[in-house]
């Protein structure tokens, strides 16, 4: 999957929120947001799939520790529409990441890497980032 934006040295601390707004492609199959220490150490791989890898209208989350993927977690809540502008807010603490979807629904994903700061963000797939904000 082609990578769009890559940012490093973010220094996002526990309790702070990363707000990502972007446009989902009209013919979207999937997109992703990766957060962590670097490309091989991700506390969150956030992958909404419209129709990809055998999943339809499902959010797949995972982590990557020293290049090794963990166990996938699937969310059936799927407020994304092709051709729409969406906003996702992600915050974290020592135990969990909290992902707030465009419709206000929130779910948690374990902070398996126990990161104390998030320094890396990448985005890819059928998603064009319009705005990244820290709160």
Curated annotation (Swiss-Prot):
Residue numbers carrying N6-succinyllysine: 108
GO biological process assignments: apoptotic process
SUPFAM superfamilies: Concanavalin A-like lectins/glucanases
Modified residues (Phosphoserine): 30
GO cellular component, one term: extracellular space
InterPro entries: ConA-like_dom_sf (IPR013320), Galectin-like (IPR044156), Galectin_CRD (IPR001079)
Cell compartments where the protein resides: Secreted, Extracellular space, Extracellular matrix; Cytoplasm; Secreted
Domain (Galectin): residue spans on this chain: 4-135
Pfam assignment, any one: Gal-bind_lectin
This protein's UniProt keywords: Acetylation, Apoptosis, Cytoplasm, Extracellular matrix, Lectin, Phosphoprotein, Secreted
Domain of life (superkingdom): Eukaryota
N-acetylalanine PTM positions: 2
Annotated GO MF terms: lactose binding; laminin binding
Free-text function comment from the UniProt entry: Lectin that binds beta-galactoside and a wide array of complex carbohydrates. Plays a role in regulating apoptosis, cell proliferation and cell differentiation. Inhibits CD45 protein phosphatase activity and therefore the dephosphorylation of Lyn kinase. Strong inducer of T-cell apoptosis.
Record protein name field: Galectin-1
Organism: Bos taurus
